């Protein structure tokens, strides 16, 4: 279940069917809600655009 897979304490997801970004709970980075499913310490929304899953995401 995608909702379960991308849910975490440090990086809440938005229930979107497209690539969408939300602020991390720490307030210092961006969350990849569909692409990365995890938080980064730098903005990655541009880097993640068009990526399908966490295997394609840049390292934090």
UniProtKB/Swiss-Prot annotation:
Disulfide bond annotation, renumbered to this chain: 11-39, 24-35, 31-57, 36-48
Annotated GO CC locations: extracellular region
GO molecular function: pheromone activity
Entry annotated with the keyword Disulfide bond: yes
Keywords carried by this UniProt record: Disulfide bond, Pheromone, Secreted
Chief location of this protein within or outside the cell: secreted
Compartments where located: Secreted
Summary of the function given for this chain in its UniProt record: Mating ciliate pheromones (or gamones) are diffusible extracellular communication signals that distinguish different intraspecific classes of cells commonly referred to as 'mating types'. They prepare the latter for conjugation by changing their cell surface properties.
The name this protein goes by in its record: Mating pheromone En-2
Organism: Euplotes nobilii
Classification of source organism: Eukaryota, Sar, Alveolata, Ciliophora, Intramacronucleata
């Amino acid at each position: 279940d995608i909702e379960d897979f991308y849910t975490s304490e440090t990086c809440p997801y938005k229930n979107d069917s497209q690539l969408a970004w939300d602020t991390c709970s720490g307030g210092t980075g961006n969350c990849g809600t569909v692409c990365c499913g995890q938080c980064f310490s730098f903005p990655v929304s541009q880097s993640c655009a068009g990526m399908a899953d966490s295997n394609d995401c840049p390292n934090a």
